[in-house]
Amino acid sequence: MRELKDFLEAIGATYEPNGERLNVNVRRFVADPEVAAQIRDRGRLVYAGRLLGRTRGEFIPGAGLLHELARMEGPNKVWVDERVGWLFACGRDVFAESILRSEGELTEGTCFLVMLGGDCLGYGRLESQGEKTILKNIFDIGDFLRRERGLEENR
């Protein structure tokens, strides 16, 4: 689960999942040790315990993990208003001037959780594009809906 550790390090979080970590295909889970032992005995798995996220080159956190990280002290966070939050959830990037406040140093290459009030909408990486500084959207809560819409259009 090196990818999970890399993700947590990138956003400045010191998070240790309670339970045993399980890899099922590209998905990463955590389950109680007793449950994990029973799961392993069953053979072929599809889902096991609580989803942390999936790995496709890099770790993509699940909504549950983002929710947990949002409640913690320590991870880098930026807060946006409702309009910017909606655009971010639709896959758009955040301009630096749209950030209302932040926890963590706003330096290029740093990853931040994007917050709307107490809710985490996803995360991004601070980048420069010419004269502008943006928070590049890496993952947002609208990802699932966009993937589902793509499946519907392909039917």
Protein language model features and the residues they cover:
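Polybasic, low-complexity RNA-engagement segments
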Residues: 1-155
